[in-house]
Amino acid sequence: EKGTRRVLGRGTAVGKLAKQMLGRTPESITAVRPLTDGVITDFELCEAMLEYFIKKSSRHRLLKPRVVIAVPGGITPVEKRAVFNSAERAGAGRVYLIDESKAAGIGAGLPISEPMASMVCDIGGGTTEIAILSLAETVVSRSIRIGGDEMDEAIVDYMKQHYSLRIGTQAAESIKIEAGSAFPMDGERTAEVRGVDTISGVPRKAVVTSEEIREALREPLEAILIAIRGVIEQCQPELAADIVDTGM
């Protein structure tokens, strides 16, 4: 809430519930992203969000839980310290920071502890983490501040330029999920989108195809591909040979 900076719903308007409010709030209320591109942009609200998550997941109110937070590999030590301190102030007992790429490898069940290469490309909301892992360590990695949010903005721009239709990022994300792809699919899809005509100012809808969404996503996807290629080029030949067999 503007002015008081109070979190609605007695502090429960967090996460998916808050995301649903993006672009739909009255002037007195603001839906905020306390983290942008993997970096804290609003410390007070970030701590409120973490406090909510910790309370929701904690079974014992008297015991402070251990918290593991995945952070982009490209953030600075100062930014890491900010995340660490915010988690502590939010009620965490012990705080552990782990690179997003390593967390993604563990979550995907990859054999990152083995003496062989495992390659990960984790496309998040604000960043994309690319890494080659071996023996539980990161051999080569790169973090770029391009992710799902950038793709949503690209779709918003495409709809405005080609359809004279103004849509929000939530609608763009729905189109991306429903019809988006990096390569042609066997069965091309279509998605219906509603927005406001930029010329008449009247609400209307349009239907877009997978091919159009691929065109809209071309620039952010090309940036990710260039980063992937750069990581592979820095990799040792033996590990690169593993990637030929194991893929990404």
Name each region found by the language model.
Residues E1-I123, A131-M248:
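Nucleotide/phosphate-binding catalytic cleft detector across ATP-hydrolyzing
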Residues G126:
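Conserved Rossmann-like nucleotide-cofactor binding loop
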